[in-house]
């Protein structure tokens, strides 16, 4: 159900589970180089397409990777919202977001502000989450999974 239908942004965390057609799953460990680049899993790149977006994740210290379609659907879903609802979400999600296009080696660059928000060190885990992916610092992800 789109967030505009139930108004529960914390639950949806800015994602679009209604978009369908995408299946991402698995955990993939990678490293980030000194320029903020990482090899993005080929299996997930196939699902995301050639152009996608990376944003902060509401409620978690990780990053969300959106398809171009889901990113545009999120933008559209916010247009009719009152400013008191829309502006804080837009500032949080769009203000620090970056576009990603894998290079010939399959690497993507993650903006410094996004790396800082998620506490990304040189070791990260990319997690397939059905219709989107998340990028976590490896130690933070291990601590999170051990706590549940």
What does each model-found stretch correspond to?
Residues 1-30, 34, 43-100, 104-105, ...:
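Flexible "stalk/tail and boundary" regions
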């Amino acid at each position: 159900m789109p967030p505009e239908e139930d108004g529960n942004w914390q639950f949806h965390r800015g994602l679009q589970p209604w978009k369908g057609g995408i299946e991402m799953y698995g955990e993939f460990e990678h490293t980030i180089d000194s320029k903020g680049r990482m090899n993005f899993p080929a299996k997930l790149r196939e699902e995301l397409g050639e152009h996608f977006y990376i944003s902060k994740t509401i409620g978690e210290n990780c990053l969300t990777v959106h398809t171009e379609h889901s990113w545009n659907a999120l933008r559209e879903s916010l247009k009719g919202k009152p400013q008191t609802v829309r502006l804080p979400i837009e500032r949080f999600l769009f203000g620090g977001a970056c576009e990603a296009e894998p290079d010939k080696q399959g690497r993507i660059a993650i903006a410094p502000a996004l790396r800082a928000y998620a506490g990304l060190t040189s070791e990260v885990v990319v997690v397939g989450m059905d219709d989107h992916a998340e990028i976590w610092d490896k130690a933070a992800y291990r601590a999170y999974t051990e706590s549940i």
